[in-house]
Amino acid sequence: MVPCRLRPFLWNSPKVAVKRIPRQCIEGIVVSTKMQKTVVIEVERTKKHPKYGKTVQYTKKYKIHDPLEECSVGDRVLAHETRHFSKTKYFRFYRKLY
């Protein structure tokens, strides 16, 4: 195995293809719009309990970037994963779902 410092720089080679990481897409309901250009959405997921086998609902809240502030509380929205806007905000508003 070649040590790291002796490996050729592959990213400068024209033959190397750049791989894109598939981005996550989430759907949820807007819970809060009290921050500037940020909304909080709640995403529900159903999962089987590992031991008992019962289907359990889990909820998680995400902060998403809404630059035009077009969301309001109760809207069902779609958001895409993107670069970090802050420590906890790494989703961008895509569109409303009706």
Swiss-Prot record:
A Pfam family this chain is assigned to: Ribosomal_S17
Top-rank lineage group of the source organism: Bacteria
InterPro entries with a match to the protein in the record: NA-bd_OB-fold, Ribosomal_uS17, Ribosomal_uS17_bact/chlr
SUPFAM superfamilies xrefs: Nucleic acid-binding proteins
Record keywords, A-Z: Ribonucleoprotein, Ribosomal protein, RNA-binding, rRNA-binding
Gene Ontology MF annotations: rRNA binding; structural constituent of ribosome
GO biological process: translation
Gene3D superfamilies recorded: Nucleic acid-binding proteins (2.40.50.140)
GO cellular component: cytosolic small ribosomal subunit
PANTHER family: 40S RIBOSOMAL PROTEIN S11 FAMILY MEMBER, SMALL RIBOSOMAL SUBUNIT PROTEIN US17M
Sequence similarity: Belongs to the universal ribosomal protein uS17 family.
Function: One of the primary rRNA binding proteins, it binds specifically to the 5'-end of 16S ribosomal RNA.
Self-association state and partner proteins as the record states: Part of the 30S ribosomal subunit.
Protein name: Small ribosomal subunit protein uS17B
Protein's organism: Bacteroides thetaiotaomicron (strain ATCC 29148 / DSM 2079 / JCM 5827 / CCUG 10774 / NCTC 10582 / VPI-5482 / E50)
